[in-house]
Amino acid sequence: MSEGMEIGGVSLRHLAQTVGTPFFIYDEAMVENHLHTFRECLSHPELETQVVYAGKAFLCGKMARLVRDAGCGLDVVSGGELAVALHAGMPAERIVFHGNNKTPDELTAALKAGVGLIVLDNAPECAALAALAEQLQCHANVLLRVNPGVEAHTHEY
């Protein structure tokens, strides 16, 4: 690590000496800039668009607040990520709940929170969500992910 290497004006050598290694560092200004740029580029008066940050890339309360403050949505894949998003003040209607093998408790939490979109992977999950929504007397916006079973033959690497 060279003496002058910095991210966001912070010396990496200083960080390594202060917090130890390895460590992750995100440049807050750069993240904010990218989120705003995506929103600007995808904004069109004839389209209803939403930029959604994938929490599985990295999620903590601070990142959720950055995403929220940029006016973007947040994609979560577990009940834990949903809890982080809600605790950070992310509006539930801007949360997209993905994740395979979502538990009944996770689906219930998403419904009770009023999550904007729940992505379903199969018919049994759709039936389970419908039953829970009926039981809770609420509405769910869903997207059904379909795998048509078409094989794409690609190289081995």
Where in the sequence are the language-model features?
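Glycine-rich, aromatic-flanked loop segments that form ligand/cofactor-binding clefts
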Residues: 139-151
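A charged N-terminal "starter" segment
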Residues: 1-141
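Active-site loop/helix belt of alpha/beta enzymes
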Residues: 132, 148-157
